[in-house]
Design a protein with these regions (language model features):
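Single conserved hydrophobic/aromatic residue that forms the stacking wall/gate
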Residues: 1-13, 271-278
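Glycine-rich phosphate/ribose-binding loops and adjacent secondary-structure elements
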Residues: 178, 182-272
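Generic structural signal for beta-strand residues in well-ordered domains
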Residues: 2-5, 85, 181, 238
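Flexible, glycine- and charge-enriched loops at secondary-structure boundaries
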Residues: 2, 158-165, 221, 225
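Non-catalytic, usually N-terminal nucleic-acid engagement modules in DNA/RNA processing proteins
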Residues: 10-181
């Protein structure tokens, strides 16, 4: 299936790396570049679905970890999937829950098989494998889903960052094998922390799995913006041209503009809606 078609933006934008395109999903087309409002628990805080449509929102991001914790992916599936559950008939993207497992869950224990962690809600022990993460995302039923990954925090040394990147690649292979739903586009996630050689390896090994899109993870995790932009500059020109690029967790107005200038098609960020309910 041809998921993505690029469109020219003009010479000045081409020189900067920016581009425009259309991403096709079962719930409609998405014109890129695009910002995704974050509906962590299947709702964008303080905003009704009809209001999101009125302001032109094309796609919403929902969080796999939080929906798995409550109300549970099986319940969402029984309700007809996320689109019916949240009364949203446009495209939805779910992350894999990997970032939350490592950042929110207490006492997590990472193994090649998967991750043991205690729920931040009630403390119960859970075990998430790449296959389990895909099964949860299949149940949720989003149009675009992410592979399960290990995100290393800013300041992690080279050895740890390399191990996390290599584990992410192994998990990607397992995610791809487990994913059977042709109506959901699976994106691999590029990791490698702030080490350019690791980023390049991660991207190269992920491209065979990037049939419908690719995500850039592990940025905006505490590093100065100059370092983030430097990594993005380094990656520009190395991405496949025929699929969308999703910059995860980055979407403040200045970062959005800088990302688009560096060839990014899609961004998501919670802080544009959280201040409205403070």
């Amino acid at each position: 299936r041809d998921y993505y078609a690029s469109r020219g933006l003009g010479d000045v934008y081409k020189r900067q790396g920016a581009r425009a395109g259309v991403f096709h999903t079962p719930h409609g087309d998405i014109e890129t570049p695009v910002y995704m409002p974050v509906g962590t628990q299947a709702t964008v805080k303080g905003v009704l679905p009809r209001d999101l449509k009125e302001v032109g929102a094309q796609i919403i991001l929902a969080n796999t970890y939080h929906l798995y914790m409550r109300p549970g992916d099986e319940l969402v599936k029984a309700a007809g999937g996320l689109h019916k559950f949240m009364n949203w008939d446009r495209p939805i993207l779910t992350d894999s829950g990997g970032f939350q497992v490592f950042s929110l869950a207490k006492l997590n224990k990472i193994k090649d098989e998967g991750v043991y962690f205690n729920s931040h809600v009630d403390g119960r022990l859970h075990f998430i494998t790449p296959e389990k993460a895909i099964a949860i995302e299949n149940n949720l039923g989003a149009d675009i889903i992410m592979a399960f990954d290990q995100c290393s925090e800013y300041g992690a040394d080279y050895k740890f960052s390399k191990a996390a990147m290599e584990r992410t690649l192994k998990w990607l292979e397992r995610c791809a094998a487990a994913h059977k739903n042709e109506n959901q586009a699976l994106f691999p996630i590029v990791q490698g922390n702030m080490f350019k050689d690791l980023r390049e390896i991660s991207l190269k090994e992920s491209i065979p799995y990037a049939k419908h899109g690719i995500a850039i993870g592990g940025l905006s995790v505490g590093e100065p913006k100059e370092i983030m932009y430097d990594i993005m500059d380094f990656m520009l020109g190395k991405y496949p041209a025929d699929v969308p690029r999703y910059l995860m967790g980055v979407g403040s107005p200045d970062c959005l503009i800088e990302g688009v200038k560096r060839g990014i098609d899609t961004v998501s960020y919670t802080h544009l809606t959280l201040p409205t309910i403070a």
